[in-house]
Structures are given as C-alpha cells and as structure tokens.
C-alpha cells in the first residue's frame, strides 16, 4: 500500500485539540471537519492538505481520545501521516478510519516542507523523492494492515464474513 504526495511538516506533541478543536466535534461530515483541521496551529492547512503527506515529530495525536482527529485529517485530503511516534489511541483511530500511518524515526530531521514523498505502509519505509533518501520505519502487519487495506474498520467488518 503506497501513497505519494508533498510533505507538510510539523513538530512534536501535536495533540488532538490542535488537530481538530473541540468546538467542531458537533460535526460528523469529514469534509466539514477537514476544513478546520490543524486550525489553531496552521489556519492555511486545509488549502495545502489535499494530496499531501503530513510529517510530524514525537507523540502525534496525544491528548483526548477523539476519532474525529483522524477523520478531520482524512477529510482535509491528507494521504498519510508519518511521525516519529504516535499516541496509541490516535494510531488505532487512524487505521480504523482508513488513514494510513507510518512511524519513522527522525523523520522531521530528514524531510522538508514540500519534499515529494512516497510512503509504503506495508513495506515500512518512506522514500524522499526530492533527496533520494529512503527512511526505514515500522511496517504495519496483520489485522491493522488488513483493516487499513479495507478502507477502515467499518469496511473491514462488512467484508469479513465473505
């Protein structure tokens, strides 16, 4: 499972309140949530997110448990999130909504804003097409990969009995 897009780079400890502020949790439409993704940190994020790979530092998605954070990023058009580490609940929520995630050590030191990236979730690597550098990460395996390939948990469960 591969995706390709331009990098949008942020730092460490981006919490779910930054990814989607609480005042927008009344909405369920992914497109509406996407219009407000990352609003406190980067009001221009929705304009640059479509077809992008979000790159972040440590503890991405920490804070309160809200699946709307992953839905908002997907609704904004983010193709994948690559981070040095993830809060476990965000990581699982992303997989459950069909948003590819990959953990890659030191990725924020090796990727710049606007770099063209290819992310291979199953292979567990990121290829920086701008620099030619390949960064090894932690590949998804087993059930999490199957859920992601199905497009999320709901789709996975719909097809599991077949």
Swiss-Prot record:
Coiled coil: none annotated. PANTHER family: 3-ISOPROPYLMALATE DEHYDRATASE SMALL SUBUNIT 1, 3-ISOPROPYLMALATE DEHYDRATASE SMALL SUBUNIT 2-RELATED-RELATED. It catalyses: (2R,3S)-3-isopropylmalate = (2S)-2-isopropylmalate. It is an enzyme of class 4 (lyase). The keyword Transferase does not apply. Pfam families: Aconitase_C. Gene3D superfamilies: Aconitase, domain 4. NCBIfam families: LEUD_arch. Its EC number is 4.2.1.33. Heterodimer of LeuC and LeuD. The keyword Amino-acid biosynthesis applies. One of its GO terms (biological process) is L-leucine biosynthetic process. GO terms for molecular function: 3-isopropylmalate dehydratase activity. This is 3-isopropylmalate dehydratase small subunit. Disulfide bonds: none annotated.
